[in-house]
Amino acid sequence: MAPTPPKDRPNRYTYAQAGVDIDAGNELVRMIGPLAASTKRPGSDAALGGFGGLFDLAACGFKDPVLVAANDGVGTKLKVAIEADRHDTVGIDLVAMSVNDLVVQGAEPLFFLDYYATGKLHVDVARDVVAGIAEGCRQAGCALIGGETAEMPGMYAKGDYDLAGFAVGAVERDGVLPRGDVAPGDVLLGLASSGFHSNGFSLVRRIVEDNRISYSAPFPGGDGASIGEVLLAPTRIYVKAMLKTIRETAAVKAVAHITGGGFVENIPRVLPEGINVEIDGASWTMPPVFRWLMELGGIDDTEMGRTFNCGIGMVVVVREDQALEVSDALAEAGETVFRIGRLIETVPGAARVAVKGALGSGK
């Protein structure tokens, strides 16, 4: 015997009744078309709507290119954006996390694709997110050539969404980083970060929530900016400054993107065995937002250093006699540069990355 259907069951079902609004999706595509078009660069037409995005590598002038690919997300920084109801910066973060991973291998970002998933599509929110993605692409010089918007009823809490990004770049085969001549005595240059970037936000949120602090509250000494605004400062995109410096000086040996794991986990990724790292913690000043969180949560120096960038978002390895030239080139390109340490020969039993003094303790 067949079960008796509920009295409120519709006679005919539609996708919209199941929670998927195709019309809203089409409206979003219409709204973001001009945003994608604003990222056009040689090799792309930056037009959306096809089954796949096209890119003409031959138009970029490479002679013997190697393709480099990266993908990443924004993590739980998205929860801060949702709580603060500000969605126009996390798209920049999304692009930054992938393109910064490309440039550390010497690669020029060429194109980007995004994935936006939510339980219910709110077109205005999604449009703000994509506006940030387009801004990030413009900062990095890459084209937004496609993406996916997934409306999945029942998969996410009300108002939540998730992001993933995918970037592809290219570098001449003989220009791939790190180079093979990284050696003890080389100098480490640190490029200032814009804040937490997109790492460690599960700890940030836990501390803020346990202290019952509103994201709309003013940040102490923040000139009127709210805590949410300070925390949502977008990840700095180092691509154009790094590419210019790499090409003009030919002096960059290796580059590390300082993300989750901090100096301890990220710098060794670009070094050969037999080389250790010595960091002078007093060579730069940790930005106020890090000090604020450190004091609010009682976080010790070790935990700060293995969770956050502590004010340095990228580390560049150069020969000592070329450090000033590279530092000046990066500064001229708009970066704030610190000489933060050096490479030394491995000492048995010593930590791979040793920090003298507290990170960012300079005055």
UniProtKB/Swiss-Prot annotation:
Q: Which residues cross the membrane?
A: none
Key words, A-Z: ATP-binding, Cytoplasm, Ligase, Nucleotide-binding, Purine biosynthesis
SUPFAM superfamilies linked? PurM C-terminal domain-like, PurM N-terminal domain-like
Chief location bin: cytoplasm
Task: Report the leader peptide range.
Answer: none
User: Which GO molecular function entries does the Swiss-Prot or TrEMBL record give?
Assistant: ATP binding; phosphoribosylamine-glycine ligase activity; phosphoribosylformylglycinamidine cyclo-ligase activity
**GO cellular component terms listed in the entry, alphabetical order:** cytosol
Q: What is its EC number?
A: 6.3.3.1
Q: Where in the cell is it found?
A: Cytoplasm
Q: Which Pfam families does the record cross-reference, listed alphabetically?
A: AIRS, AIRS_C
Q: What class of enzyme is it?
A: ligase
Organism domain of life: Bacteria
- Kindly state a single biological-process term from the GO annotations of this entry: adenine biosynthetic process
> Catalytic activity, per the record?
2-formamido-N(1)-(5-O-phospho-beta-D-ribosyl)acetamidine + ATP = 5-amino-1-(5-phospho-beta-D-ribosyl)imidazole + ADP + phosphate + H(+)
Identify the metabolic or biological route this protein is part of: Purine metabolism; IMP biosynthesis via de novo pathway; 5-amino-1-(5-phospho-D-ribosyl)imidazole from N(2)-formyl-N(1)-(5-phospho-D-ribosyl)glycinamide: step 2/2
Which HAMAP family does the record cross-reference, listed alphabetically? AIRS
Which NCBIfam families does the UniProt entry name for this protein?
purM
Please give the name of this protein: Phosphoribosylformylglycinamidine cyclo-ligase
- Organism this protein belongs to: Parvibaculum lavamentivorans (strain DS-1 / DSM 13023 / NCIMB 13966)
